Structures are given as C-alpha cells and as structure tokens.
Amino acid sequence: MILLTTKNNHFNLDSPVGRVLWYILSIFWQGTTTRQTTFCKEGKRHQGTERIAHNTCGALTKWLNFLRLKITTFSKRYQSHQHSSAESWFNSAFLFKFASQFIIFSFLITFLPLSSYANTQSFTLANGLKLIVKEDHRAPTAVQMVWYKAGSMDEHNGTTGLAHALEHMMFKGTKNIASGEFSAKIAALGGRENAFTSKDYTAYFQQIDRSKLEAVMALEADRMHNLNLNEEEFSKEIKVIMEERRLRTDNQTSGQIFETLYANAFTAHPYRHPIIGWMNDLENMSIQDVQQWYNTWYAPNNAILIIGGNVNTQEVLNWAKKYYEIIPAKQVPTTKPQKEPVQKGIRRINLKAVAQNPQLVLAYQAPSLPYSTKQEDADALEILAAVLNGYDNARFNARLIRNKKIATDINTDYSHIGRGPGLFIIAATPTEKTSLTELEKQLKSEVKTISEQGISETELARIKTQLIAQQIYKRDSLFGQIMEIGLLESFGLDYTQSDTILKRLQNVTKEQVRSVAKQYFNDDTLTVLTLTPIPLQK
C-alpha cells in the first residue's frame, strides 16, 4: 500500500479517490513544467540586444518551483513508503486539509473568469496612436511598452536587418539626450529597459516604480520622433551587429539550422530572411537606409502604447496626450499581400556544420492567424503540437525517446498567430545507433497513427487542463499580460481575443485533431533539413 504522508498523517493513494487525486496532481505538475518551458523559450524567437522577459520567466519559475517542490515531496513518498494493509485508511484531519486545498485549486480552475483583461481600457489618440491601459495594483511598479508594426518581414531583398539595426540605434541619442543617456536615465530612476525585434514587429519596454512613469513616458515619446541618427554612432554599432550575427548564427549550429530552414521553407515570403539580416546586407547598410526605415515606420499611427501596473487610467491618458499626442502622424505604407506559392513537393537540404550530433528537422507548411482564414485548423494544430510534445509523457517523449530509444531529444514548435504563413516544426536528435532516415520514418509514423486512430479523451482533457493552468499563471504576471496584449495587437488582432482563442482551443474535438494530422502532414508541403556534423578545425 502506498500512502501520501505528512508527519503522522496518511492518505491512501491506492484507494480509488487517492488514485484520482494523484493522477490530477501528476497532470498539473507535468503541465506546469511544459508551459513554463514553452513560455520562457519564446524569447528565442526574438532578436535584440538582450533576450526578453527575464523578469517574467523568473517570477513564473519561482512560483512553479514552489508548487513542484510540494508535489515532488508527495511523489517521493508515493514511491518509497510501503505500509501494511492495516494502514489502509487515512487520517481524517489530513484528508480534510488536503481535500480543502485541492477543492480551492479546482474551484480556481473551474470558475476563475477567463477574462484576463479586467480593468483594461483602450483609447485612440488624435494622431492615431493606440493606447491600452491595464490597471493592476498588486505591486508598486509600472510597465511601459511601445510596439511598432514593422519587423524583418517588411524589409526587401538587399536591405535585410534594418528593423534590428534601428532597434540598436534607438539607444544612441535624440535631439534632446546624448548617446547612451536613455538607458542611463532609466537606470537612475531605478528601472530596467530593453527592446526586441521579430519578423513581425519591433518593441521597446521599461519597468519602473509607478512614481517614475511620467518621466519614462516622456523619454520614450522623445525617441519616437526625435531620434538623432549619425554616421559615427552607426559605424560603430553596425560592427556590433555583425559580431552578434557571427556569435548567434555563423558560429552557432542551431542558428545556422533555423536560418537555413526558413530560407528554404519559404521561397517568396520575406519570412525567409533572418531577423538580424544577411551578412552581405549588413556590410552594405548605410545610415541613410536606417534613417529611411525610421522615417517610414516609426509613427504614432503605426504603434501601440501599452501601460500597465499600479497606475490610474485617466492619469496615464493625460500623460499620453501630453507626450505622445503631439507627435505628428505619418503616411505609413500599406503592406501588400505577400502570399507564399503553394509547395508542390518535398524539399530536402543537408547542412554541414560543426556539431557533436546529427540533427533532423521537419517543417510542414501550416496556417497562422490572421494570415490564414483556417481558424479551426490552426486551433487543432496547436492542440496536436501539445499531444506530440506538450508534456513529459506526450507521444514523442514516451514512445520514441523512452520506449524505442531512437532519439535523445525531440521538440515541436508551432505558433498559430502571425502576420505571415506558419510552419509546424519537429526537431530531433537521434541516438547513436539510429539513422536520420529511421528517425524521420518514426516521427512521421507517430503523426500518421494520430491521423488514422485519433487521440484519446484523456490526452485531450490533459491538454485542455494545461491551457487553463497556463492562463492562470499568465494572469499572475503583469509583464506577461502586457506582452500578450502587444503580441495580439501587433498581429492585427484585438487584445480581447486572447480569451476567445482560449475558449476556441477548449472546444477543439478529437476529430479535428485527427483531421489536421491527416491534412497537413504530407510530403508535398514538407521541408526536411538534416545536419551532418563536421569536426572542429584545430
């Protein structure tokens, strides 16, 4: 008999109720691990002077580690304590305490309002700037984020890397402050700041004491229209950017893999270009190119200003009008539709790079919103990604890594939101005795099994439970909520659609998951990249 114990209290985990409770705890534990990892890995999708959301991941990690410590304690006792049948009953006092805590958690999961954006208001200023204010009075801090709807996908051949280069130059002074003074002023106010560039947008943020918010808003508004771009600063910074490219891409295997993958998976859409830019384009970039990018895209009517934290909405609105509304609107170019041609056959690329192990990456063309209108398919693919690789006992982990032992690591990556077409990516490292051909065959076989047999109600319920838990964790982080607002708005979606998306995911059926596994996972839309390791030259 296996008992969950604390001091002198015992709870029988071999009883029917005990097994159910332990099963739910296990799901919860695995779900938190997966979602924490997924959330914190999001920073890898962005290019910037530093990676984003360290504070968010740190807070999330601390909270989840506390929960895992409690569950791990139970787990160890579950595995190690053996008792006689005479101990088959449990202490009623402990049961009451444990059950009470569990009921509270269940209540939160079941009845906590799905709306993440209570106390949130949206405004449009006279110059077209969209302002969103999120009041959250749990801590005496505030966050300001400015998102520009311009990323590397808005660049053209020969000018790649401009969005990221301007991100660097935004810290090099304005007509009112000297180079480096922006960061120095934020630090002097006791705050932290950074920026990041993606294929779809560029964003800047500061996190400061609520009492310093007005000063920080004035600083950010200043560089929206008074940036001082000069040749001397640019000539130094472009060398920094080129070195960053060498460090993160040219001399890093994973960087080479995904740069090569995107360059081949897309033939016409600008997603094929790296965010940091091709080295030849960086070598030929001029300060005039950066100035033109700034003049074209950095306008209040092409930006979203998000303020959150221990703030007063009316006060923030007044400050926004004072510092931002005076900035003139611009004629922002209308982005023309850029459709990726239909892929009509498998594409195979072999990359040779310095590495210890071979790698295999499968990338299937997939819908993303709002670029695609296939909303239900995108939702079902999000669920499928979790079924394959969304928790410790997901199919790839359980069957290919632990059971068949043909891979040491498998990851899936699919984001169903983006301004351009999506990719459903499966990346794997084979074991020493497994060929890449066999690994590819087995990965495809797992997806084919789902397309033919579907998934179980247990799998689907587990994933949906994780989605609800993820929403709860997200609401505990002010920075995380503001990040999500910015992401949705920069993609052309209203921030309130976060809850709509969650509800849609909760309504995905087993048949929908089976259907997308059959529809999207075929060789006609597949790009395969294999990595052949080469030894490091001494």
Where are these regions (language model features)?
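Charge-rich, well-structured scaffold segments of protease-associated domains
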Residues: 124, 183-332, 350, 360, ...
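His/Glu-based metal-binding/catalytic segments typifying zinc-dependent metallopeptidases
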Residues: 263, 332-393
